[in-house]
Regions:
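N-terminal intrinsically disordered, cationic/polar leader segments
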Residues: 1-41, 45-87, 92-146
Length: 146
């Protein structure tokens, strides 16, 4: 992984074997970024994608493997009261299964880079977006701080 700050954004190039969410979180820790948004594209070798099932109160996870084109990645990182980062990431992958084109999309739990990923990380300027625990989903939503 290599990254540069240009203007107010960070541009991150990831390499084979990098886990995208963990790498973004690592850059935020290194650069003392408390809240940010990001987007990106790339090629991955596996992914765990989730969809929230409100009737069950839990996430359903699907794992896909192979040559996965990361068509779109978007998300944010926010800071919980204990200082830890909480992430919310969605992804869209295109791939082939038995020679047929497929897409998979949803909440991204994890994905590993196959050849590269290119991410733009945009720190929030002028404050911090905190995290508030939503009891219905047991996940963190934006919690604005005064």
């Amino acid at each position: 992984m290599e990254y540069r700050k240009l203007g107010s954004s960070y541009y991150i190039r990831m390499d084979k074997g990098d886990e995208i969410v963990a790498t973004i979180r690592d850059v935020c820790r290194r650069e003392d970024i408390a809240s940010a948004t990001f987007s990106g594209i790339g090629g991955c070798q596996d992914a765990e994608i989730q969809v929230f099932r409100p009737e069950l109160g839990e996430f359903e996870t699907e794992r896909i493997e192979g040559l996965l084109e990361l068509v779109s990645l978007t998300g944010n990182l926010i800071q919980k009261d204990d200082g830890e980062l909480s992430h919310h990431v969605h992804a869209l992958f295109a791939y082939q299964c038995d020679g047929e084109p497929r897409i998979a999309a949803g909440h991204l739990k994890s994905t590993t880079v196959l050849y590269t990923a290119e991410i733009e990380l945009r720190p929030v300027e002028g404050g911090v977006i905190g995290a508030s625990l939503n009891l219905d989903t047991n996940t963190y939503f934006w919690g604005f701080r005064d």
